[in-house]
Amino acid sequence: MDVILLERINKLGQMGETVKVRDGYARNFLLPQGKALRANAANKTRFETERATLEARNLERKSEAQTVAEALAGKSFIVVRSAGETGQLYGSVAARDVVEILGAEGFNIGRNQVELNTPIKTIGLHNVTLHLHAEVELQVELNVARSAEEAERQSKGESLTSADAIYGVDEDALRPEDFFDPEADGNEDDE
């Protein structure tokens, strides 16, 4: 099906372009969301008459997204979750959790604007991409930790999954030569 795009859509085209898409994509997403019109003579003339208002609305949305992006730029958000000794979370941090965290800080972001291919399942520093507008994209850092104190240590660059961080033991002291006597022949019954 040929459609006229009413806004820029990633991997599809710019506003005003006539593109060919699958029927289901057009019927189930583009047309109901108001992102496109069927490409026929009546809709082409309708689009040309409304083009100025659509471009103005697009510029307004883009400027709003840029102000939010400037406010979010360089920010790090702490996520406290329970986790095992190895840093594996008992659960995960998904896109809806990212939306809740940003909402608590006063940023109104939709779940569809968060690009998180797989949920976060380990503690550590994770970068999450936000698509605020088709032309405005940024990354925020999530500091996933077991406590606020651990998040602070982690933000300074300390690894919380090492043996020292978990058990308070120096990893260098856990070398095999410390456990075995290289001089012994292996027979303990020589008495």
UniProtKB/Swiss-Prot annotation:
**Protein biosynthesis among keywords:** no
HAMAP family the UniProt entry points to: Ribosomal_bL9 (MF_00503)
Q: What is this protein called?
A: Large ribosomal subunit protein bL9
Keyword Transcription belongs to the record: no
Free-text function comment from the UniProt entry: Binds to the 23S rRNA.
Q: State the similarity comment.
A: Belongs to the bacterial ribosomal protein bL9 family.
Compositionally biased region (Acidic residues):
179-191
Highest taxon in the source lineage: Bacteria
Looking up InterPro entries in the UniProt record yields: Ribosomal_bL9, Ribosomal_bL9/RNase_H1_N, Ribosomal_bL9_bac/chp, Ribosomal_bL9_C, Ribosomal_bL9_C_sf, Ribosomal_bL9_N, Ribosomal_bL9_N_sf
Q: Which Pfam families match?
A: Ribosomal_L9_C (PF03948), Ribosomal_L9_N (PF01281)
Annotated region described as Disordered, given as residue ranges: 149-191
The terms under GO molecular function for this entry are: rRNA binding; structural constituent of ribosome
What are the annotated GO cellular component locations? ribonucleoprotein complex; ribosome
Keywords of the record, alphabetical order, are: Ribonucleoprotein, Ribosomal protein, RNA-binding, rRNA-binding
Fetch the PANTHER family from UniProt.
50S RIBOSOMAL PROTEIN L9
BP terms from Gene Ontology: translation
